[in-house]
Amino acid sequence: MLNFVLRELTKKEILSLYKRFLTKFFAGNDESFLISEAAIKWLIARNLCRCYGLYDDKKHLLCFGLFINDVERRVMLLDYFIVLKKYRGYNYPEIFFEMLTEMSVDEAEKNDNESILLGIFIELAGIGDMSAKALDKRQRELEFYRKLGAYITDIIPEFSDEEYNVLFMPINARLTRLELKAEFLNIYKEILPSFKDKKKYIRRLTEEVDGLI
C-alpha cells in the first residue's frame, strides 16, 4: 500500500513547477488561462499564493494545486490543479483534497482556531455555448467537487467575457451567503489593485438559501 505525503511547496519549487508543467499544460489554445511568471512571483512576494504537492512514498510528485489566498489566509481560491500525465486515471485528486482538508483541520486545532482556513473557492466555467464534450467534462468536474463537499454558491465573477460559477468547499466553517461574498472579495481585492466597486464584478445568480442549488 502506498504512503502519500502532502506538503506545501517553497517559492523555488512553485516557480519550477510553473516552468516545467503549467506552461506545457496550457500550451496552445488554453494559453489565455495561464497567468504570467511575473504574476506568480508578484503573488508569492505578497504571501498571496500557496502551492501543495502530493507525493508517493518514492518522492514522486503525483499532482499539485496552486491556490490564491487573502492576506489573513482565511480562504483560498483554487487557481490551477494539475495531475502529472503518467499518473492520471487514479484517485490521486481525491487523496490530495482529503489530505489537504485533514491538514487544515489539524492546523486549526493546534492554533486554537486562530488564522484557520475556512474553506476553498473553486471557479468552474459557465455553461454558455459549450460543446457537448466540454459540457460533459464540466459535469464530471462538478460531480468530483461535490463528492468532496463543495457546493455552488450564488457568486458569478465578471472579470472578463468568460462566465464562471463559483463553488465553495467548507473546511473549518460553513459560511453564510454574505460571508461567502465578503471572503471571495477579500481575495480579489488583493490581486486586483483597481478593484473598487464590488457590484461591478459580483452579481447574484440565484435566490436559493445559502447559495445551494
Regions found by a protein language model. Give the residues of each.
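Short amphipathic alpha-helix that is part of the acyltransferase structural core
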Residues: 1-39, 55
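Conserved acetyl-CoA-binding loop-helix of GNAT-fold acetyltransferases
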Residues: 83, 89-108
